[in-house]
Amino acid sequence: MECQNDRKILLAFNQPITAKQVAGKTGIPEDTCSYMIAKFAKNGMATCLNPIAGNSRLYWLTESGKRCQKDLCRKLNLSYKEYDLPNIDWELYGWICFSHRSAVIKTLNAPMQPSKIKQTLRIQKPNIKISANNIRDVIRLLLTKKIVQPIKIKKKAHPRYELTDSGRIFRQLLINSNAHIGQNSSNHIYKTGDN
């Protein structure tokens, strides 16, 4: 790794992630992350898990990339743990990584109506531009993909929505993808240190 950005980006791979997620973790501009990840792929260090996607392309390290990451961790005195790639639909997960979809899924930690999702998002992410209609549209899309399911509650006119089993797996992946270098993740842990 010849530059600081290369090292930061390589260390950001705690699981399959998008260039936008790498940018959020490292503070490196998204365009630079996209360029560097494409360079990793060209050099055989990373591979795209959803190559037909137009947006939210997911990348993961090849065996060569994992060796480089492991060597870098050893060199920087960081702990390293191998990530077991789960057997999930990576095309679908890439689709979920789109901004509004991921925001709704990360917010659904209990059965909620779209209005409650909006209220929670307003507190958690005050700068997000999403309307109640956008949230209802996202919920409809997530229903068709079997990521959420409706829950009817007695004496309530409108259903609440909760994540299905696959939705909970996707939610955990989204949360882990936001873990910064040095933070613990349930699957991949680095000690703090300068990168």
Regions found by a protein language model. Name each.
Residues 1-8, 77-106:
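Short alpha-helical segments that sit at the start of domains
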Residues 1-5, 51-74, 153-176:
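Short, cationic-aromatic polyanion-contact patches
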Residues 13, 37, 46, 59-61, ...:
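Fold-core signature of tandem repeat domains
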Residues 28-42, 128-145:
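Short amphipathic alpha-helical interaction segments
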Residues 41-51, 143-153:
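A short, conserved structural fragment
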